[in-house]
Amino acid sequence: MDKQSASGEIPAMRWEPYHRRDPRNAKELSKTTSRGYFLDHLEDFDSQFFGISPKEAEQMDPQQRISLEVAWEALEDAGIPAKGLSGSDTAVFWGVNSDDYSKLVLEDLPNIEAWMGIGTAYCGIPNRISYHLNLMGPSTAVDAACASSLVAIHHGVQAIQLGESKIAIVGGVNALCGPGLTRVLDKAGAISSEGFCRSFDDEAKGYGRGEGAAAIILKNLSRAINDKDRILAVIKGSAVAQDGKTNGIMAPNAKAQQLVAQNALAVGNIDPLTVRYVEAHATSTPLGDPTEISAIAAVYGVGRDSQDPCFIGSIKPNIGHLEAGAGAMGFIKATLAIRKGILPPQANLNKLNSRIDWDKAGVKVVQEATKWPETDTIRRASICSYGYGGTVSHAVIEQFLPLSGLESLQTQSPDGPGVLLLSGPQQKRLSVQAETLRKWIAQDGRNHDLSSVLTTLATRRDHHDYRAAMVVESHDDAETALEALAKGADHPLVAQGRVLGTDIRKDVVWVFSGHGAQWTDMGKELLNNPVFYRAIQPLDELVQAEIGLSPIEMLLTGDFDSSDRVQILTYIMQIGISAVLKSNGVFPQAIIGHSVGEIAASVVAGALTPAEGALIVTRRAALYRRVMGQGGMILVNLPASQVEQELGQREDLVVAIESSPSSCVVAGDRDVVAQAAESFKERGVKTFTVKTDIAFHSPTLNGLIDPMLEALAEDLAPSTPTVRLFSTSLVDPRGQDLRDIHYWTNNMVNRVRLTSAVNAAVEEGYRIFLEVSSHPVVTHSINETLMDGGLEDFAVIPTLLRQKPTEKHILYSIAQLHCRGAEVDWKAQLPGPWADGLPTTTWMHKPIWRKIESAPLHTGLTHDVEKHTLLGQRIGIAGTNTTVYTTRLDNDTKPFPGSHPLHGTEIVPAAGLINTFMKGTGGRRLQNVVLRVPVAINAPRSVQVVVQEDQVKIMSRLLSDTPQATEDDSSWATHTTAYWARDIQEAVDPIDIAAVKKRLGTRIRDDFSINYLDQVGVSAMGFPWAITEHYHKDKEMIARVDVNPAVTGDAPLPWDSSSWAPILDAATSVGSTVFGTPALRMPAQIDRVDIFTSQDPPKIGWLYVEDASDAAPTSHVSVLNEAGEVVAKFTAMRFSEIEGTPGVSGSMESLVHQLAWPPATPAEEPLSIDTVLLVSSDAATMRQYANTIPRGVRSFEFSSVQDLISQDKSGLRLDKGTAVAYIPGEVQSLEEIPAASESFTWEVLELVKYIVKGGLPLKAFILTSNVGSGETPTALAQAPLFGLARIIASEHPDLGCLIDSENPVFPLTAMRYIQGADVIRINDDVARTARLRSLPRNKLHPASQPPRLLPRSEGTYLITGGLGVLGLETADFLVENGARRLILISRRALPPRRTWDAAPSDLQPTLAKIRNLESRGATVHILPLDISHPAAATQLSTALDTLSLPPVLGVVHAAGVLDNQLILETTRDAFTRVLAPKIAGALALHAVFPPNTLDFFLLFSSCGNLFGFPGQASYGAGNAFLDTLATHRARLGDAAVAVQWTSWRGMGMGASTEFINAELESKGITDVTRDEAFGAWLHLARYDIDHGVVLRSLAFDEGEPLPVSILTDIAVRRVGVAAAGDVPGTAAAGGADAIPSSGPELKVYLDEKIRGCVAKVLQMGAEDVDSKAALADLGVDSVMTVSLRRQLQQTLKVKVPSTLTWSHPTVSHLVGWFAEKVGK
């Protein structure tokens, strides 16, 4: 309204990455328009509000972030609680056109992460809104350039009109994160160099780009009226079109703009002359504005009187051109103009555009704020929006005029106090929200009726988990209460709390307490409440008729000191209070009555009428007069059981009430009670006197039973309760006895069992208790009971407090209920109109912006990796003889082509450092080369090569992740030093290669050095050299080397041919293998390195090595050309031995393992098992086991799991100490195996579900019969249970395990003493558990025999799963190793070859692979066959006969299906679908190719069944069968091998993803590359074994618990890493981080540690982690869950099961779990 313009300079941070990315950018950026309409803090986002981790938020386009916030604000402004839309068909259509952030982050290739895809996609903007609000309607991004958001509105209208959605959230967004499009628009002349929009102005020369977001909520008009919504305007019509072929695709078309406007008017049947205002697109371009005005004039200006123009305007000069968001912004401006009846003035307008004939146009620019003409019977406006690609859109809106009498629908709220609600997803938000609302109420809020404000907050806003509710009666009250909340001060009527946990029942138990709540004025104020009065008035008449006393009069006068009157008024008050609670929207879901309170409880539960309740209490009170003054009661702080034992059989003093586990009420004769009180006090036991002179619930009242039976004999007709009703008069609180006369005599004389009733409610899940009374009587007792049960998350709330305002305190109790998550029908309490204009959510923003780590590196600034040096930018130091080369080194710039790991970390080979020195100095001799510290590439580092006179050295420092870090933050390390000389004077004699070969005599294997290095842990070479001849004797060797065998003939090398590094790397490597004892050695010092030629090094040469060891391993290595001339030489190259670390180095020795079964370690404390439930369909085998169960252990037998379940339902006791033993039956033939295996596994799954879902305290064991031997069909059929058991142990770690025995002897000892195992094998009567170990040397395949597992050119090789990724890679490997005929079996057929070129794109990689195989000389046959089909063996045999190929010599079974499901969610169909290809498929192959008919039979299994990957029960079971089938065939002499693979990086069903990598890491292992996998195959080929486990172990800190015990023997420990106290179960003595042993201190400690782990994973502050919030709501996704498990395990030194965060979804839950584990 003030003609303000928001144009300004672009924030500096926006373009900063582009300055760094390329030096040329600076020049371009200096020419790019830097002014526009920018948000000051685009990077700010409240990620916590939406449960998005900062890590994920950083990967989200800011457009997604601000759209989320704006959409939320729009819903709040519309009075539509977002959570109420969950699961609805609500649509989201969002205009979006900018992908600046996407370009920014996705062009930073080394740092791309998984969530960046959806995080930067256009669709991610509406989809993110739909996802976070759980909306199920259409969710679409609309890209129509600058028309996008008005088109989105059009789509929203259509979705509602077509019935797709009832509500649509529509809008648009624009964010300018990069300079690219601005540069484009600069060159196109579309934007103004001054960064302003000057719509309609004569000086308009382009627009100023703007950013922001707009959201609009759409509803069908009739629905909005019915829902009592605030309707801002009505969309009468909208239209979208294209402007066709114009002078250019970006040129506007007036005719098209005119037609789309006419279409929109026609949709709404609107006369254009009734439209008073048009919000124009008005991009301020010389061509665009006149064109658009001509179109507007043609539609809206024709027929207009000059005094009655159509006004036009545009919001762009105020906020800029928001491009994709522009239409929505214009729509909002037009809507507000209609609503307020004022036309806003145009900004940045000095002189009207002279190219437009304004006098004839019939339209007029609004130059000053103008009141909407009153001549308009209804205000109407139109909005134009056009895209530069030709999209034209138009909408017509009008004023909403309420229907006559509509206001009468708005019921006015009652006067008096009400409840003001606030909430937030985190506790810290409440004070911020409170202060925001307080300021509003102090100013604008004064213009609103307070009840409408309360209604808005209660019924039109979302209620988050952290809540505050305050009872207020005026604006001043509200201000005071909000100020207290904002400042954290106490206020008697401000309730705060967190909703009970997500898995906790929120239903409320109303507890009606007994005698003792009375106080003088307890009902006086409530009598003014019409609801209260109406509820008790009929009862007042009844009581008067019975005893001549008026309860209402007694409440008014306070005359009710006697016990009989108190009894009556207790009932009356409870009935009245109940009515008031219900009128305020609070209802009970369960009820407990205590003493006389049971009467009102029964009435409210529907078991009695109010009149019946009044008769009971009145007539019983009359009888009480007979015993008044004779008795007494005291509350004693001792358990009822103890007091009862002390009292013995006394009748004059008894336990009358079991109040809580630690207190009770004693009743009896007056004097006896007084004496007892004194006695208890003398013992130091606290007692409290109950204000009564009657010994309720004691034998004193036995004399009243018959009179009471007589008094009520004909007057009660009890009903079945309609609300869950717990009894305190019956021994069983769940007893459903009718509340008849006998019940009430029992209620009078029997003990009150409050503790039992409360515990029964707790057992049924109730955690919220509301005491309905005039003052809390049992609240404390209920609290004690709940705390005694170990509960922490619960609420016990009183309704009234003595001497406190009753009306407000009932509301305060409701406020407290709401804060704990109880359901309150606020519309019942606040039925009136709601207010608009209340503040929306106050965002707690934090800057979140992706730091662009890498930038393209340019010549001269870094080293040339093809030259194999670290020589980067050369800097001469003025006035010195010093030259410095600087560069950056990381994985992308390593100066060697291969891999050179040491202990799992890539390092620059020594040859690369020497090459660097030679090239950097220009010298040909190095002396005293000292290799101090390897140059590691594990993290980016800055490297300097310093040449200072005759010295040279290499130094580096790590590059800090912190932008503010200075060079001093990371000290420089010196890696290598040397002295250099330019010329060599001495000559060197050639070496007679033939003579040396003859002298040595013995030619050894060409791969001797490679195998030697592989054996000691060197997994790969930095350069691809190969030895082609090798001779060795004693301390000499000579070897012919080819630095790149893949390059043949005259083809150029793939690097700079002048580099000496490749051949010198061969020299240092071969030179370390001359020593007799293999060890991992590195060059440490070299006396001299000489280069004797100025020519390039030879591609093929010879290495002459001499062992020159003295104190240390030392060698001389001469590099010869083919003529024997010495071209280079290492003199006295000394090596230092490095401690090997298998598993980290990556050698084949460390990648390939076998499964061993060493004896298990027994536990010190045995598991208690006194009862065994045997389950088996094989009665004979079950009887064998049963006969060996030791005496003293009970046993029961069941024919199936279903039999056990049915017996349980009929009353079988299943206590702690009971174990279920499932015994799969025997199988006689191979044909029975598939059905039997499926039956066995499914029975076990049913057993697990039965135990876990039922929460039964049982252990479960699976007892198999010698599966480990693989000898029999029984062993094969039971084998899948091995894999299944490991998955069960992973998902439910405390359940039990599988025990495999050679004989059917019941393994009770193993059950009791071998704890924490998943599979136990009993061999030679010794219990054993699995461990991974190195392959046994005694199993090496004799070198004299043909190699195993490799193809021969004359054979045929068959691969199942042949068209899968692994199948095709296997085919490639076999062809690479000589196979020439392949049969690829797949369930899918390929199209005819003639159609391959036209095949779908997703099939082309497969076809290309096959063509490649054929181009290399292989014949490939595709056999479409389901190998798991029952007839597969026959079909395969027939197909082989038809093909008439040479014999099949090798089979690879790589077929498989993966369908991950947690055990509790597994279905039989899904389980079988995965199991069949593994079992039936393997058996079909076994039948077609019996043992000893092939060269090899290779089965692709998985290490997942050894490590227990959660969700892979079916997959693990199937792979366990393959493992045993390999054993079975091997026992028969067959070359069968099962390979238990880890994940192949980027390939197959286990293709490495962020989630799979995290899951592997959580188990302590990692994936392998394709080359490593086939290297493992070749390594396995050297051994005669039936299985190999291929994986790489991670390194663990000393003292860190292993995630799985199977790694015990191969795990690598980082020695010396652990600090004092890091050993499991210990802490540094007296250290600051010592773990408390138990109690509250332990829980505080664990809460801090666990929140720290969560914060680390989420990349947020620990203070922002809410202990009671669901981890998923904090932003922990499936990938982060795995990372979190490892963090917890490392921090707390406790093994963490894979499903822990699923079953314990909050930090508080985790604290409880870890407290139990750490406590042990």
From Swiss-Prot:
Keywords, sorted A to Z: Cytoplasm, Multifunctional enzyme, NADP, Phosphopantetheine, Phosphoprotein, Transferase
Domain PKS/mFAS DH: 868-1144
Residues annotated as domain Carrier: 1644-1718
Annotated catalytic residues: C146, H281, H321, H900, D1065
Region (Product template (PT) domain): 1148-1545
Reactions that this protein is recorded to catalyse: 3 malonyl-CoA + acetyl-CoA + NADPH + 3 H(+) = 6-methylsalicylate + 3 CO2 + NADP(+) + 4 CoA + H2O
Region: Dehydratase (DH) domain, residue numbers: 868-1139
GO molecular function, one term: phosphopantetheine binding
CDD domains: KR_FAS_SDR_x, PKS
Subcellular location: Cytoplasm, Cytosol
Biased composition, class Basic and acidic residues, residue ranges: 16-30
Cellular-component GO terms for this entry: cytosol
Main localisation: cytoplasm
Ketosynthase family 3 (KS3) domain location: 1-399
Domain of life according to the entry: Eukaryota
Region (C-terminal hotdog fold): 1001-1144
Enzyme class: transferase
Region named N-terminal hotdog fold: 868-987
O-(pantetheine 4'-phosphoryl)serine modified-residue sites: S1678
Pathway the protein acts in: Mycotoxin biosynthesis; patulin biosynthesis
GO biological process assignments: fatty acid biosynthetic process; patulin biosynthetic process
UniProt region (Malonyl-CoA:ACP transacylase (MAT) domain), positions on chain: 509-823
Biotech relevance: Patulin was originally used as an antibiotic and specifically trialed to be used against the common cold, but it is no longer used for that purpose since it has been shown to induce immunological, neurological and gastrointestinal effects. Genotoxic effects of patulin with dose-dependent increase in DNA strand breaks in brain, liver and kidneys have been detected in mice. However, more recently, it has been proposed that patulin might also have anti-tumor properties.
Domain-related comment: Multidomain protein; including a starter unit:ACP transacylase (SAT) that selects the starter unit; a ketosynthase (KS) that catalyzes repeated decarboxylative condensation to elongate the polyketide backbone; a malonyl-CoA:ACP transacylase (MAT) that selects and transfers the extender unit malonyl-CoA; a product template (PT) domain that controls the immediate cyclization regioselectivity of the reactive polyketide backbone; and an acyl-carrier protein (ACP) that serves as the tether of the growing and completed polyketide via its phosphopantetheinyl arm.
Entry function: 6-methylsalicylic acid synthase; part of the gene cluster that mediates the biosynthesis of patulin, an acetate-derived tetraketide mycotoxin produced by several fungal species that shows antimicrobial properties against several bacteria. PatK catalyzes the first step of the pathway which is the synthesis of 6-methylsalicylic acid via condensation of 1 acetate and 3 malonate units. The pathway begins with the synthesis of 6-methylsalicylic acid by the polyketide synthase (PKS) patK via condensation of acetate and malonate units.
Protein name: 6-methylcalicylic acide synthase
The organism's taxonomic lineage, starting at the top: Eukaryota, Fungi, Dikarya, Ascomycota, Pezizomycotina
Record gene name: patK
